[in-house]
Design a protein with these regions (language model features):
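Flexible, solvent-exposed coil segments and beta strand-coil junctions
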Residues: 36-37, 80-84
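Long, highly hydrophobic alpha-helical transmembrane signal-anchor segments
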Residues: 103-121
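Short, glycine/alanine-rich hydrophobic alpha-helices that insert into or span membranes
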Residues: 53-61, 104-107
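Alpha-helical transmembrane segments of multi-pass membrane proteins
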Residues: 59-71
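Interfacial/capping segments of alpha-helical transmembrane domains
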Residues: 68-80
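Interfacial helix-start motif at the membrane-water boundary
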Residues: 83-103
Length: 283
């Protein structure tokens, strides 16, 4: 319980920090219009996306022959008995799952209650990206049925079609990494969203967010739960989930999800009471 309390405290600190940043630090942030009014003209998928996807696939294939090497190196007594590495891996693992989801939902809830549009916007779109990444990852895990290194560190080639769908078969749901996907989905969503508010901020926000996501991925390798190629493919899925969710919402500002959850209908009645409802349209 003490360990869980420590994780919760860190999440509260991180969420508070993100909230202060998102609510508008400095006059530049305050002078900019609400993010939800920004309409992107970019197509959902571009040629650049194809090149990025090919890069991730190439990286996954390139690392595959080295999976066993990295797994062995990380499981040496020197690394596993290092208290600093143990604590760091535990913290980042929690930040990946369930921490990222807690932060996303928390930011959305606080943003709605406090009427901080940007915080609610980021929380909602970030949470959507996490759910999309998680759904995709779990589908691929079930199909691939790859054995985790903790099942047999000498057999990185153990793939059995559909094995990951069987109940109680978590040891055979290694590819791709869910924690990695969640970390990179959060990083991509935050980077994409904030780049629309503060175009010149990407140079420092992106390294911080993607650096944290990389640490989440590395923690799973350290814990012997994933091979190197697992975390690269998880990073690919998360990155695309985060960027595409944000791009979709900003190119379709009238979509139902944003209308329902970011812009509820508020009506003041003659008796002075206020009614709040969802702005649902029917066609």
């Amino acid at each position: 319980m003490a360990g869980l309390g420590g994780h919760v405290n860190k999440l509260l600190i991180l969420t508070t920090g993100l909230g202060l940043a998102v609510s508008g630090i400095g006059p530049v942030a305050q002078a900019q219009p609400a993010d939800t009014t920004h309409i992107s003209r970019d197509p959902l998928f571009t040629t650049k996306d194809a090149w990025i996807a090919m890069g991730f696939v190439a990286g996954t294939i390139a690392l595959y022959p080295a999976d066993r090497y990295f797994a062995r190196k990380l499981q040496t007594p020197h690394n596993q008995e290092n208290q600093f590495l143990q604590n760091t891996a535990t913290d980042f693992r929690f930040m990946g799952t369930p921490g990222s989801l807690y932060i996303g939902v928390g930011m959305y809830a606080v943003g709605r209650v406090a009427r901080i549009d940007r915080m609610a916007d980021l929380g909602l779109h970030g949470t959507e990206a996490l759910l999309l990444a998680s759904t995709t990852v779990n589908l691929v895990k079930g199909i691939a049925g790859r054995a985790r290194p903790m099942a047999d560190i000498e057999n990185e080639r153990s793939f059995v079609l559909g094995r990951g769908f069987k109940k109680g078969n978590d040891l055979y749901r290694s590819f791709p990494s869910g924690h990695s996907a969640m970390g990179f989905a959060a990083a991509a969503a935050v980077t994409s969203e904030t780049s629309k508010w503060w175009p010149n901020s990407t140079w420092f926000i992106a390294p911080v967010m993607y650096g944290g996501a990389t640490m989440i991925a590395a923690s799973r390798m350290y814990n012997n739960a994933h091979w190197a190629s697992d975390v690269v493919m998880g990073a690919a899925i998360g990155t695309f989930a985060g960027t595409k969710v944000v791009r979709y919402h900003h190119s379709h500002p009238g979509n139902r999800i944003d209308k329902w959850l970011l812009h509820p209908h508020v009506e003041k009645k003659p008796d002075g009471t206020v009614a709040v409802g969802l702005a649902i349209e029917t066609h």
